[in-house]
Curated annotation (Swiss-Prot):
Gene transcribed to yield this protein: AGC1-7
Catalytic residue positions: 271 (proton acceptor)
Entry's family note: Belongs to the protein kinase superfamily. AGC Ser/Thr protein kinase family.
Upper taxonomic lineage: Eukaryota, Viridiplantae, Streptophyta, Embryophyta, Tracheophyta
Catalytic activity: L-seryl-[protein] + ATP = O-phospho-L-seryl-[protein] + ADP + H(+); L-threonyl-[protein] + ATP = O-phospho-L-threonyl-[protein] + ADP + H(+)
Protein's UniProt name: Serine/threonine-protein kinase AGC1-7
Amino acid sequence: MLTKPGKKLDSSESTHHTTSSNYPPLDIVHQTPQPRKEMQQKPLFDPKKMDNLIKPEPAGFTNHHRPNPSPKIPSSPGSNMTESQSNLNTKPNNNNSNNNSNMSSRSNSIESTSSNPSKPHTGGDIRWDAVNTLTSKGVQLGISDFRLLKRLGYGDIGSVYLVELRGTITYFAMKVMDKASLASRNKLLRAQTEREILSQLDHPFLPTLYSHFETDKFYCLVMEFCGGGNLYSLRQKQPNKCFTEDAARFFASEVLLALEYLHMLGIVYRDLKPENVLVRDDGHIMLSDFDLSLRCSVSPTLVKSSSVHAAGGGSGSSRPVGLIDEDAAVQGCIQPSTFFPRILQSSKKNRKAKSDFGLFVNGSMPELMAEPTNVKSMSFVGTHEYLAPEIIRGEGHGSAVDWWTFGIFIYELLYGATPFKGQGNRATLHNVIGQALRFPEVPHVSSAARDLIKGLLVKEPQKRIAYKRGATEIKQHPFFEGVNWALIRSATPPHVPEPVDFSCYASKDKESMAAVDGGGKKNNNGAGGGCSTGGGDNKPNGDCNDPDYIDFEYF
C-alpha cells in the first residue's frame, strides 16, 4: 500500500503526527497508508514580522450549544485561556449560566458517561440498543466493559481501537487519549473540544458518540466503527488512483451536507481531507477527527423571506421584496436546503416556484444565514496541502477555510493529487500563496467540475464561492445538477465495502488482555498522541497470533 507524506507542525514540538481518527479497513494491519499530517505552528508568511509566533488556541471556547468545559479535565500546564480567547472575534456566550445547571446530568467520573439523547438519525441503531441494555441495569460503562481487538489507527492526540462491548455482538471504535501526554503537550482542551462536539452532533454523515469515560490515565471516546476505511485508502485502489466524476460528486455531496450542518452549529471543521472521510459499511461517508475544529457562536439571520411573508412588504421599496440589506447581514449563508433542495434554486420570472411539499406554491422558501464567517481565529492548524491562504498569511480566518479545503478535496478526488503540492512543505505553502491554479490534461474532467474548483480555490476568502451564501450556493452549482439532496441517503454509493468478518474475534474472554506493566517501548515519532505502545517488533509478552490478544500495554 502506498503511503502519502504529510506533516502536522506544532510550535511546541518538532515531532510529526498523523491524523487521530483514521480507521483503515480491517484487512490492513501493518500497511495502512500514512495520512498527511496536520500542522499547528506560527505562520511562515507574517506580513509584519517573519519570526512572529502566533500561539495556537484550542478550538473550544465560545459556544451556545453545549455546557462549559468539564471541571474534570484540568487546564494543561502553560495554557492561557484568556490569551487564546482574545484571538477569536466572536460574540460572548450568554448561555453559560443556563448550561451549568445541566452539568449534573453529565458525568465525567472515572467510570463513564453514556446516554442516549433524542437523536432522530440514530433511531433503530443496534449500538444504542446494546448500550442502553447495559445502562438501563444501572451499569456505568467503563474500559472493563469493552474487549479491545485491534488498533485501527493513531494520530496526534490518541489511538483508535476496534472494540467489542462485552456480552454483546456489537462493535465500536474507541479513541484512547493519554492524559499525561495531552497535559505535557498542552492539548487537553483539544481532547475536550472533540468530546463536546461529538456529543452535540446528530447527522447521518457525522459520528455518533455512544459513550465517553475516563480512567486514571486515559480519556476514552466510544464511537461508530466504519469498516470501509477512508477515502484516501479507497482512492489508492482506483484506476489511476483517482475517482470517476460520478463517484467524486457522490462523496463531495455528502461531505457538503456534513459541512453545512457543522456551520449551522457554529463549528468550523478545519481538517477536511480524504484521510478524515471514513466509509461506512453501507458505502456512505462519515467525517471524523474534530480535535482541530473551531467552535463559535452563530445566529441565524433571515436573508430572504418567502413570498408569503413578503406579500405585506411596501410596494414603494426599490429593494427586491423579501431581501434585507446584504451589508447588514452576516457574511455567509446556510439554508435549510438539505431538506428542500429544489425550492431554493433561483427561478426564472415566468417559472412557477412549486414546493415538493406543497408549501409556498407561488413563492420560495426563506433563506437563513448561519455561516460563522465573522469569527477570526489566528490558529495555524491544518494540513500543508489543504491550508487556506488566509491561514498561512496569518490574517485570521473563519468558516471560509472549509470551502477552500472542500475545493482541494474535490480536486484530489478527481485528479489523484492536490494542486499546490511542492517539493517540501515550505514550497507547498509558497505555492498556495503565489501559484496559480492549474488543471492537468489527464484525466479528463468536465468544465463544470473545473469551474466549481476555481470558485472554491479563490485566494481571497471574500471572493470565494459560498462566502456569502454558504453551502446553498455550492449546491446550486452545475457540478451538482441532478443531485437529490433530500434523498441522498437513499442513493446507491459508488463503492460498498466487503462486510467485515468479526468471527476471528470470537470472544474467549481471556484475562490475558489485562494490563501489561512492562515490555512496551516509547514511540518516538509522536504516534498516538505520545502514547506508548507495544507495536511493531517490540511486542510485550503474549501470543500475538491469538485474536483475543492486543498489543497495547495499558489494558
